[in-house]
């Protein structure tokens, strides 16, 4: 049985997961409908669709994995189930981080304003940058998959039990975990770098506009401030996701500490939930579609009230 604190945290995580699935499903559907309507999908539309779809899977894996560990620990420790979940998690996590990285770099190259020759060279070659990122995904996934298979083969016994035996020493597990996630860590560094550089560019540009005296300047400055806030929020949420996942991994060595494990789950679930809301509110296409949905619901509700009277 769960304690009161554990139950509250698990409820919060479940609500976050539900909102994350709804928000990302909405983003995926909007871009899918745009694809069907225009017979093509823009780069940003493709990235948003891929990010939303992969995060739906991530949310389901996070929440189902947590419920299995908390309420069905005996079945969860089976070797075959652990291997399947590990492979699916590794693949989907790579996809999620890659789409987030690509989206960050795409916005950076599109919006940022630097005079450095490397930036200008990259800005003129977005297709090559996109292809390079795709190769990064494939290579990092292949490396991670090979290490995952190697670790699984070297631990045929007690595969689901990280707390006993000599095969899963903490030091060995930590080194294996870093090697398995070296590609994801590299993508994380690229994402943070692109976001920080974009924040610097927007901040410099907003300061330059402060010398102008016009209402147009005020609108531009406000837009830049909103963009900076969005980027800072994304960075915080993205880091929280990795912290939450790391906490869940650490809990493999202390399975009796359910509160810490659920705290990690709650922390990790914040990112797919809140970032989808931020995307809907800041992306004009998604925001318009969301407003139409709300208007449709309001019209339907008014129609029911009229029929009732």
Swiss-Prot record:
Q: Which residues lie on this side of the membrane: Extracellular?
A: 1-9, 68-86, 150-177, 250-258
A single Gene Ontology CC annotation of this entry is:
membrane
State the CDD domains in the record: 7tm_TAS2R10
Q: Does the keyword Glycoprotein apply?
A: yes
Presence of keyword Metal-binding: no
Its transmembrane ranges are 10-32, 45-67, 87-109, 130-149, 178-200, 227-249, 259-281
Q: Where in the cell is it found?
A: Membrane
Q: Which InterPro entries match?
A: TAS2R (IPR007960)
Any one GO molecular function term = bitter taste receptor activity
One Pfam family matching this protein: TAS2R
Spans within the Cytoplasmic topological domain: 33-44, 110-129, 201-226, 282-309
Describe tissue expression: Expressed in subsets of taste receptor cells of the tongue and palate epithelium and exclusively in gustducin-positive cells. Expressed in 15% taste bud cells in circumvallate and foliate papillae but only in 2% in fungiform papillae. Expressed in the duodenum, antrum and fundus (part of the stomach).
Summarizing the function annotation, the protein's role is:
Gustducin-coupled cycloheximide receptor implicated in the perception of bitter compounds in the oral cavity and the gastrointestinal tract. Signals through PLCB2 and the calcium-regulated cation channel TRPM5.
- Read off the PANTHER family from this record: TASTE RECEPTOR TYPE 2 (PTHR11394), TASTE RECEPTOR TYPE 2 MEMBER 105 (PTHR11394:SF132)
Give the misc comment. Several bitter taste receptors are expressed in a single taste receptor cell.
Q: What is this protein called?
A: Taste receptor type 2 member 105
Can you name the source organism?
A: Rattus norvegicus
């Amino acid at each position: 049985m769960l304690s009161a604190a554990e139950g509250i945290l698990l409820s919060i995580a479940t609500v976050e997961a539900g909102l994350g699935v709804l928000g990302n499903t909405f983003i995926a559907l909007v871009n899918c409908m745009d694809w069907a309507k225009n017979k093509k999908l823009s780069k940003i539309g493709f990235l948003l669709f891929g990010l939303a779809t992969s995060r739906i899977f991530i949310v389901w894996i996070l929440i189902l994995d947590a419920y299995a560990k908390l309420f069905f620990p005996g079945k969860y420790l089976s070797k075959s189930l652990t291997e399947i979940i590990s492979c699916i998690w590794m693949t989907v996590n790579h996809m999620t981080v890659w789409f987030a990285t690509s989206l960050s770099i795409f916005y950076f190259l599109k919006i940022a304003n630097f005079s450095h020759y490397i930036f200008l060279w990259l800005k003129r070659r977005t297709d090559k940058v996109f292809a390079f990122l795709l190769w990064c995904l494939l290579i990092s996934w292949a490396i991670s998959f090979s290490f995952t298979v190697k670790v699984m083969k070297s631990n045929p016994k007690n595969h689901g039990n990280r707390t006993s035996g000599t095969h899963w020493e903490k030091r060995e597990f930590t080194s294996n975990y870093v090697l398995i996630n070296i590609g994801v860590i590299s993508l994380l560094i690229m994402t943070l770098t692109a976001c920080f550089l974009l924040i610097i560019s927007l901040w410099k540009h907003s300061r330059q506009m402060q010398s102008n005296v016009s209402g147009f300047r005020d609108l531009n400055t406000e837009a830049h401030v909103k963009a900076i806030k969005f980027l800072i929020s994304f960075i915080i949420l993205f880091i929280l996701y990795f912290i939450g996942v790391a906490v869940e991994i650490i809990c493999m060595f202390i399975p009796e500490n359910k509160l810490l494990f659920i705290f990690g789950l709650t922390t990790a679930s914040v990112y797919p939930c809140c970032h989808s809301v931020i995307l809907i509110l800041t992306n004009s296409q998604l925001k318009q579609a969301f407003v139409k949905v709300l208007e449709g619901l309001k019209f339907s509700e008014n129609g029911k009230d009229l029929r009732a009277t």
